[in-house]
Amino acid sequence: MSLKNLNANKIHRNLQKKIINKKIKHLFNLFEKELRIREKFAVAVSGGPDSLALAFLAKVYSIKNKLAIKFFIVDHKLRKESSNEATKVKKLLKGLNINSEILSWNGKKPKKNIQSIARKKRYELLFSKCKKYKINNLLLGHHLDDLYENFFIRIVRGSGLKGLASLEKKNQINKINLIRPLLVFDKSDLIFISEHVFNFFIVDPSNKDFKYTRVRIRSFIDELKKEGFDKNKLFLTIKNLRRSNQTLSFYVVQNKRLNSFLNQKKNELI
C-alpha cells in the first residue's frame, strides 16, 4: 500500500473516531436514517456550523457506504473577507481528507434583494457543477431553525397551503434532487458537531443585520419563546400541513388523469 493510501486510511480512521462521542454518534445515526441514499452525491458548504456539520456527517456516511462524494464551497464575494474564508474552509476540510472545490460568484453585485439574488446565483453555480460531474443529488444544510423561520416568512407573505408546508426534505429543480437531511436537527446540535470536529466555523455578520427579513423573523421567534412558544408543536403543525398538501396534490393529479381518461373515451364514442 502506498504512503498516500496509508495516510488516507489513517485520516478516515480519525474521522470515524469522532463518532465515538456519544452525542455525535446519536446525531450521525439520525443523519443516516434521514439520508438513506445509495448513489453518489454532492454537498454544499458555506463554512457556517450547519454546513460544516453536514460536511462531516456526509463524509463519514460516504466512507461507511463506499459512495463517491463531492464538496462545493460557494464564495459569493459579497464581503471582502469571503475569499479568504472560503480558502480557510477548503484547508480545514482537507485536514480530514475532504477534498472540495470553491465556486465563485464573479461580476457586479446587486444593491437590492441581495440575499434573494445571491441564493439564485448559488444554486446556478451548484447545479452547473453537479451536471458537470453527472451528480443527481445535492445535500443542503437547512435545519429545524430554518424550517421555523421559513414558515413565518411564508405567513408574512400570505402564502397558501403549499407555501406554509415550508421546506421539503427533498424536492427537484433542474433535474437535481435537493436533499435536506438536517431538517430534524437543532442548530445547537450542528454547532456542537462543528466545534467538536473542526473547532471552527464562520459567523456571517449578515445573520445579525436587521435589514434582512429572515433576521427580523429570527428575532421575532426568540421573543415568542419568552411567551411559551413551543417549537415541537410548530414542527407538528408544519408536518400536518405538509401531509395535507401532499394529499391534496395527489387528488389533483388523480382528478386530472380521470378527466383526461373520460375525455378520451368521449372522443372515441364521437
Show the residue positions of the predicted features.
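Core alpha/beta nucleotide-donor-binding catalytic domains of modification enzymes
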Residues: 2-220
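ATP/NTP-dependent adenylation/nucleotidyl-transfer catalytic domains that generate, transfer
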Residues: 173, 211-270
